[in-house]
């Protein structure tokens, strides 16, 4: 089995990393009582989604911020807060929206098993401090590219 770094998969475009919409793009006033759920840091579990206190946005917001739509197999991390947690997006959450303080990892190559990656992120070999460093580097790289 080969050992591959996530950064190498990003560079070869086998995975895609995307930050959630910034506060200027998604305002608190856009949340509604009924609509499409928005996955925020508080909704991230350990490869699971916690639907308690989930917020929602309307169709116009979803259309405008379609680049932040989640798909089955995506892995969502928090950019701040509980960085040791993540959510593996199932068919149930397909079409939901990624929240502002989240980072989405999307597998673009069939040779990479997204579910395996999600399980790997749960193992003890991933130190939470390492995850903090990874998130800071990812955020820095994403901001520098713009």
Regions found by a protein language model. Give the residues of each.
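A short glycine-rich beta-alpha junction/loop motif
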Residues: 31-33, 95-103, 112-115, 132-146
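A short beta-sheet element
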Residues: 40, 59-122
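Short, basic/aromatic beta-hairpin or loop at an interaction surface
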Residues: 43-56
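Non-catalytic DNA-recognition/assembly elements of restriction-modification systems
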Residues: 1-22
């Amino acid at each position: 089995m080969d050992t591959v770094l996530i950064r190498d998969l990003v560079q070869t475009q086998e995975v895609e990393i995307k930050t959630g919409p910034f506060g200027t793009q998604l305002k608190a006033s856009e949340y509604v009582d009924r609509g499409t759920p928005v996955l925020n840091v508080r909704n991230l579990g350990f490869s699971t989604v916690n639907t308690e206190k989930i917020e929602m946005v309307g169709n116009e917001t979803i259309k405008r911020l379609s680049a932040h739509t989640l798909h089955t197999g995506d892995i969502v991390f928090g950019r701040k807060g509980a960085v040791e947690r993540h959510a593996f997006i199932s068919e149930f959450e397909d079409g939901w929206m990624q929240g502002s303080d989240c980072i989405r990892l999307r597998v673009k190559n069939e040779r990479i098993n997204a579910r395996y990656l999600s399980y790997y992120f749960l193992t003890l070999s991933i130190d939470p401090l390492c995850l903090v460093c990874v998130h800071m580097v990812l955020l820095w790289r994403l901001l520098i590219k713009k």
